[in-house]
């Protein structure tokens, strides 16, 4: 029929062309004809017009012209009437087409409905037949299975001894007749089997399994069917619900039993000590005795830190060694295990040189000895017969590009044989390295009884300059020796000084030390012209009158000179308002270092090294000098060097390679 049924109907009734298209063509023709007629009428009117002037006698002429003019108006009205008639015809045609289309569509719908109805009936017939055949087949199969089961079970029941005894004693003929009559009572109503008979009769091909029994047999087909229908196995309510214990319940029971057992175990463990020792004194003792065991286990896990272990051992062993030295019991000292390297180093009991040399050898043989040093600071202790020897080393590196700080605290308590006091070695190394700058101060303190040796090294290398300052303090009683050396050299020439040699020990015998101390202190006192300081060759006591003045003079220049050029002890710059004035520097330097004032007039610009006159052995060992005198000497030396720095930096600017610039 197509998408537009109206066109189909029009083509069916009027032919190939639709009436709508014909009416359109007609209307277009009418319009074109009207236009042509109007044009013709206008041209005729124009041709009829006269050029001559009007005459009086010819009065009816205008009327004729008026009639000719009005005539086209009447023609237009007639044309409008024709168009309206044509429009009415088109509307009637459209209405007729709509009616025809509606009737045709209703006819098609009714026909489709009939076909669908017939298809549904046909499907019901076919499906019903298939369902019936399937139902018969299933019924026959189930019937045969149930009959076979009934035969087997009946045979087993009859063959059993219990059934035979029951039949002999309790079963009688009357009872069997009553039972048979009750079971076969449904045979009177044949209507119960009508549906089954019809179902079986409709399909002769699907025959069930037939096992012939007599009517009196309880396992015959009819009797079995009666019993089966009475039980109503197919209904859901007739089924007996099975009461089974699932495995989950057993698991839950087992889990509960395990949980109860676990709950009982800690209760038993808690009840045992309380039950055995109920409220008595020993019970409390045992309860308290059990508590530390748990704490000991925790402490054992926490005591794996090597720092704590070794520090505790060091403190414990040092206490034992001190108590042994005071009480004089050699048994406690023998219990400690000395290292083999320290045994080799302890040569004699009485000589002090041997003790000091053994201490120095111990420094060198640290990697070979049992004293193991690790960079995070580990404490190891080695004890021999005698006093204590403690070495503490700390290294600190500060780099501007990559700051690396390594602190090493090393304490090794070594009790040497024949030592009267405590030998303490304190070494501190601090390295502050910028890109080309390296500063390494070192101090070493050796105390023999009350003797202390302190040495500090500072290395400041600029582009090609290296400065090393060394100080030695040897204190005998109250006597302190302190020396400082500074050396500068340009054009990348490194200078190094060994403060303490292996074989040349700064501590001599008592007799030799006394002679050297007396000789050197007298020379130094005369050279420095320290009238207010009185040096004693034996005890090194200072006069009480000039003590405060010498302390002020010794400390003030050191503090001012170390702050020279805006630098503090740590090398950091201080603000300008905290820096000392030029007048104070000049006054202090003039009082403290008069003999080095002439060094400022040098022309070459290079820094000059000022050092004290060395003795015959090449070492500065003014051990008999008092600490105040040594501070004054240090202040004078530093003041002169700072003056030289300021002079050379202001004198020659071009000698950049030879100047010492403190850099961060």
UniProtKB/Swiss-Prot annotation:
Role of this protein: May be involved in cooperative interactions with calmodulins or calmodulin-like proteins. Recruits calmodulin proteins to microtubules, thus being a potential scaffold in cellular signaling and trafficking. May associate with nucleic acids and regulate gene expression at the transcriptional or post-transcriptional level.
Biased composition (Basic and acidic residues): 76-85, 305-315, 358-367, 427-447, 502-532, 652-664
Pfam families cross-referenced by the UniProt entry: DUF4005 (PF13178), IQ (PF00612)
Keywords from the UniProt entry: Calmodulin-binding, Cytoplasm, Cytoskeleton, Nucleus, Repeat
Residues annotated as domain IQ: 93-121, 122-140, 144-170
Short motif (Nuclear localization signal 1): ranges: 251-258
Molecular function as annotated in GO: calmodulin binding
Protein name: Protein IQ-DOMAIN 28
Compositionally skewed regions (Low complexity) per UniProt: 51-64, 339-353
């Amino acid at each position: 029929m197509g998408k537009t049924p109206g066109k189909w109907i029009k083509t069916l009734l009027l032919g190939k062309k639709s009436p709508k298209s014909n009416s359109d063509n007609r209307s277009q023709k009418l319009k074109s004809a009207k236009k042509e007629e109007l044009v013709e009428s206008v041209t005729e009117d124009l041709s009829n017009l006269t050029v001559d002037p009007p005459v009086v006698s010819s009065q009816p002429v205008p009327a004729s012209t008026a009639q000719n003019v009005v005539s086209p108006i009447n023609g237009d009205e007639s044309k409008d009437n024709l168009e309206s008639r044509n429009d009415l015809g088109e509307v009637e045609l459209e209405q007729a087409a709509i009616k025809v289309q509606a009737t045709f569509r209703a006819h098609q719908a009714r026909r489709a409905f009939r076909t669908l109805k017939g298809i549904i009936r046909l499907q019901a017939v076919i499906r019903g037949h298939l369902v019936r055949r399937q139902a018969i087949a299933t019924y026959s199969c189930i019937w045969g299975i149930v009959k076979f089961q009934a035969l087997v079970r009946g045979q087993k029941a009859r063959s059993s001894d219990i059934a035979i005894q029951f039949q002999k004693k309790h079963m009688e003929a009357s009872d069997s007749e009553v039972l048979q009559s009750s079971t076969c009572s449904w045979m009177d109503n044949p209507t119960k089997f009508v549906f089954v008979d019809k179902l079986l009769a409709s399909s002769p091909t699907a025959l069930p399994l037939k096992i012939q029994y007599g009517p009196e047999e309880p396992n015959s087909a009819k009797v079995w069917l009666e019993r089966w229908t009475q039980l109503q196995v197919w209904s859901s309510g007739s089924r007996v619900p099975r009461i089974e214990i699932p495995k989950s319940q057993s698991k839950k029971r087992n889990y509960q039993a395990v949980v109860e057992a676990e709950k009982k175990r800690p209760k038993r463990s808690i009840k045992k000590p309380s039950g055995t020792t109920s409220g008595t004194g020993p019970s409390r003792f045992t309860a308290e005795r059990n508590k530390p065991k748990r704490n000991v286990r925790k402490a054992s896990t926490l005591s794996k830190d090597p720092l704590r272990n070794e520090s505790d051992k060091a403190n414990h062993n040092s206490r034992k060694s001190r108590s042994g030295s005071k009480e004089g019991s050699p048994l406690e000292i023998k219990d400690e295990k000395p290292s083999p390297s320290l045994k080799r180093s302890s040569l004699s009991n009485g000589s002090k040189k041997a003790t000091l040399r053994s201490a120095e050898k111990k420094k060198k043989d640290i990697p070979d000895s049992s004293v193991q040093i690790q960079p995070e600071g580990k404490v190891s202790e080695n004890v021999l017969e005698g006093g204590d020897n403690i070495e503490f080393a700390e290294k600190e590196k500060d780099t501007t590009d990559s700051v690396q700080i390594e602190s090493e605290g090393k304490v090794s308590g070594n009790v040497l044989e024949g030592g009267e006091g405590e030998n303490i070695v304190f070494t501190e190394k601090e390295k502050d390295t910028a890109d080309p700058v390296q500063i390494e101060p070192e101090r070493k303190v050796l105390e023999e009884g009350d003797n202390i040796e302190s040495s500090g090294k500072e290395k400041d290398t600029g582009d090609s300059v290296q400065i090393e300052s060394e100080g030695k303090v040897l204190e005998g009683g109250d006597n302190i020796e302190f020396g400082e050396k500074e050396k500068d050299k340009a054009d990348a020439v490194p200078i190094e000084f060994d403060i303490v040699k292996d074989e040349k020990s700064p501590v001599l015998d008592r007799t030799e030390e006394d002679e050297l101390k007396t000789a050197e202190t007298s020379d130094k006192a005369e050279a420095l012209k320290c009238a207010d300081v009185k040096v004693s060759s034996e005890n090194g006591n200072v006069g009480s009158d000039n003590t405060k003045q010498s302390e002020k003079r010794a400390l003030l220049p050191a503090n001012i000179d170390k702050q020279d050029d805006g630098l503090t002890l740590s090398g950091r710059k201080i603000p300008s308002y905290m820096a000392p004035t030029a007048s104070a520097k000049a006054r202090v330097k003039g009082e403290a270092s008069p003999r080095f004032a002439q060094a400022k007039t040098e022309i070459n610009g290079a820094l000059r090294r000022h050092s004290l006159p060395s003795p015959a052995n090449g070492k500065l060992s003014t051990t008999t000098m008092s600490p105040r005198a040594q501070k004054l000497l240090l202040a004078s030396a530093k003041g002169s060097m700072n003056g030289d720095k300021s002079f050379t930096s202001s004198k020659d600017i071009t000698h950049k390679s030879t100047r010492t610039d403190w850099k961060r």
